[in-house]
Design a protein with these regions (language model features):
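Gly/Trp-centered helix-boundary motif
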Residues: 1-175, 179
């Protein structure tokens, strides 16, 4: 075994390919923290929330609905940032800008914040685009979008993980069947 490993390590292309594969697979195991349409962490009033891990209805953040909060909506972002002000339904952009210093209408607010993954799209998130899909790479979609306006990079990350996990499971099952039969 040691001789085989030594020969493998001497083949630089094979050795570096193994390292690239291991790193890519390791990164893909944390796909939810890298590419997701839910925030990693939300601070709202006195609490911390992790929408990647747990379901939170919009009511948790001062909204009206019992369904899951759509964190990408400007109104939900306004509710979180301003501590649940009901004026967020009328002029969310203005309130978010005013909330930057922690004061709105000369009153202090419990300022909240949101930590997003580097790629704020899940593999199934359909994006609203200014042009027809598929779209070329831009600042929002680093590798562009596919023909149904979904982020290509997010789909690659999740697809790579799914493909490798499937290959590992098939290999283990085939080996087990081959040994037992």
């Amino acid at each position: 075994h040691r001789r085989r490993w030594r020969n493998f390590c001497q083949n630089r292309r094979a050795f570096w390919s193994l390292w690239i594969f291991v790193i890519a697979f390791g990164v893909s195991l944390f796909a939810e923290l890298i590419a997701n349409d839910r925030p990693i962490l939300v601070k709202y009033r006195d609490g911390f929330y992790s929408p990647i891990v747990k379901f939170y209805p919009e009511q948790t953040f001062g909204g009206d609905l019992r369904t899951e909060a759509i964190y990408a909506d400007i109104e939900v972002e306004c509710l979180i940032v301003t501590g649940g002000l009901t004026d967020c339904w009328d002029s969310p952009e203005m309130l978010i800008a005013e909330a930057a210093d922690g004061i709105i209408d000369n009153r202090p607010i419990e300022r909240g914040w949101i930590i997003w993954p580097p790629i704020p799209y899940h593999h199934s998130t359909v994006s609203t685009l200014d042009m027809p899909a598929p779209s070329p790479p831009d600042a929002d979609h680093w590798l562009g979008t596919d023909d149904t306006a979904r982020d290509v990079l997010a789909r690659i990350i999740y697809g790579f993980r799914l493909s490798v996990m499937f290959a590992i499971i098939v290999s283990v099952l085939a080996s087990a069947i081959g040994i037992l039969v």
